[in-house]
């Protein structure tokens, strides 16, 4: 199943507005940006994969833990792989830790933001998929699997900018 769906990239407002034809005519969910690795796992196998669609050896123990608590569903869980204390301005260190071939990463967790039920790619609105993700995170019930909170939903670039400024005023990205 992994080759069916292309990896979706997050849009960053300041980069999008610099484009000749910015894609700003849709409704978007707003999340705070953190320094993490894009990852996904497919149910029922529960093997954590990177953007390059490779298994990540440094989080094998987390894959095994999730597999032991997996709900009886089929689909793809999409998330950022994070390490406590490495969320802001420490991507290069996080990258080195997650690139390890034999040593397990410590204090690793997943910030879940999407779930594609039954591998029905691109047939369901993002907010409905997020509601499925919420249910899956609750059913897994592990502190290492966390829901990434939505800060807002809007199709108004002024609201996006106001949210970005609010986050930046608190030291976020």
Model-derived features: where do they sit?
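Short, motif-level signal for alpha-helix interfacial/capping segments enriched in acidic residues
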Residues: 14-18, 91-94, 155-161
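Short, basic, glycine/proline-bearing loop/turn elements
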Residues: 1, 139-151
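Covalent nucleotidyltransferase
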Residues: 20-143
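Amphipathic alpha-helical
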Residues: 150-173
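Charged, flexible boundary elements
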Residues: 1-25, 30
């Amino acid at each position: 199943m992994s080759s069916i769906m292309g990896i979706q990239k997050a849009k960053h407002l300041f980069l999008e507005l610099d484009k000749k034809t910015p894609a700003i005519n849709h409704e978007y969910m707003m999340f705070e940006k953190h320094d993490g690795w894009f990852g996904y796992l497919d149910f029922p196998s529960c093997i954590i994969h990177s953007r390059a669609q490779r298994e990540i050896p440094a989080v094998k123990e987390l894959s095994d833990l999730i597999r032991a608590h997996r709900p009886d569903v089929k689909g793809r869980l999409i998330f950022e792989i994070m390490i406590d204390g490495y969320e802001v301005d420490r991507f290069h260190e996080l990258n080195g830790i997650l690139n390890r071939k034999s040593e397990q990463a410590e204090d690793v967790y997943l910030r879940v933001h999407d779930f594609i039920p039954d591998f029905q790619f691109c047939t369901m609105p993002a907010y409905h998929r997020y509601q499925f993700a919420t249910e899956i995170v609750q059913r897994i019930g592990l502190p290492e699997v966390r829901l990434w909170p939505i800060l807002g939903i809007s199709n108004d670039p002024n609201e996006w900018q106001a949210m970005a400024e609010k986050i930046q005023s608190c030291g976020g990205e």
